[in-house]
UniProtKB/Swiss-Prot annotation:
Pfam families: PsbH. Phosphorylation is a light-dependent reaction catalyzed by a membrane-bound kinase; phosphorylation occurs on Thr residue(s) in the N-terminus of the protein. It comes from Pinus thunbergii. It is a single-pass membrane protein. Keywords: Chloroplast, Membrane, Phosphoprotein, Photosynthesis, Photosystem II, Plastid, Thylakoid, Transmembrane, Transmembrane helix. This is Photosystem II reaction center protein H. GO terms for cellular component: chloroplast thylakoid membrane; photosystem II. One of its GO terms (molecular function) is phosphate ion binding. The keyword Chloroplast applies. Belongs to the PsbH family.
Length: 75
C-alpha cells in the first residue's frame, strides 16, 4: 500500500518574487519557434568574430605577432 499524507503542510505553493514576476514574460515564449532562419546569420557572424579573436590571442601568445613597444615575457 502506498504511503498517505495526513496533513497538507508538505504541500507548499511557490512564493512569488520580484525577480520571478520580472522574468515570467520571457518564459512565455518557451517552445515557440520563429519561421525561417531567424537570427542564425547573426549567430554565425558572432561566432566568426569570436574565432578571429581567439586566433589573434593565440598569435600573440605564440609571439607570431610582435607588438612594438610592448615587452612580452612569459618566463
Amino acid at each position: 500500500m502506498a504511503t498517505q499524507t495526513i496533513d497538507d503542510t508538505s504541500k507548499t505553493t511557490p512564493k512569488e518574487t520580484l525577480v520571478g514576476t520580472t522574468l515570467k514574460p520571457l518564459n512565455s515564449e518557451y517552445g515557440k519557434v520563429a519561421p525561417g532562419w531567424g537570427t542564425t546569420p547573426l549567430m554565425g557572424f558572432a561566432m566568426a568574430l569570436f574565432a578571429v579573436f581567439l586566433s589573434i590571442i593565440l598569435e600573440i601568445y605564440n609571439s607570431s605577432v610582435l607588438l612594438d613597444g610592448i615587452p612580452v615575457s612569459w618566463g
